[in-house]
Amino acid sequence: DVRYRVPNVNQCKECHAAEDKITPIGPKARNLNKEFEFNDGEFNQLTYWMNRQIIDDYPMELVSPVDWTDESQNINDRVRSYLDVNCGHCHSPTGNANSTGLYLHLDETRDIHLGLYKKPVATGRGSGGLKYSIVPGKPDESILLHRMISLDPGVMMPESGRALSH
């Protein structure tokens, strides 16, 4: 049983604002850049679509996420992939949370923008009295985990849409 309410425009902007425009959160090429089973065999999805002229082209040099639920993958890659798909749309230079300086999209490489020992700038009481966004190896000292597990509407992240299936 799922209860859904239609959000108002301001609530839509919470997630769908990018560069001051409301935009859909849709598939990114990097999330589609993987093997997929088609009727005629298993192929890279983007290459398959390009060969069938469904798309014109795609960037060949893609940083693609790993399956964050796959325990055989590198833990850093798993965490980065999870944060990219669940947080990176808002937490990017063009996203609604750009003023935080916490950029969780997969292309980000600067430790400070990834939250490592980054002091909060816009969390208010969301910091829970903690000092840094992410303290490597110490999740209980990290604001990021505090906000992800909180049920307090003024603290929790994401602010709405807590579970996503990808």
Annotate each PLM feature.
Residues 1-166:
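Sequence context surrounding c-type heme c attachment/ligation sites in exported
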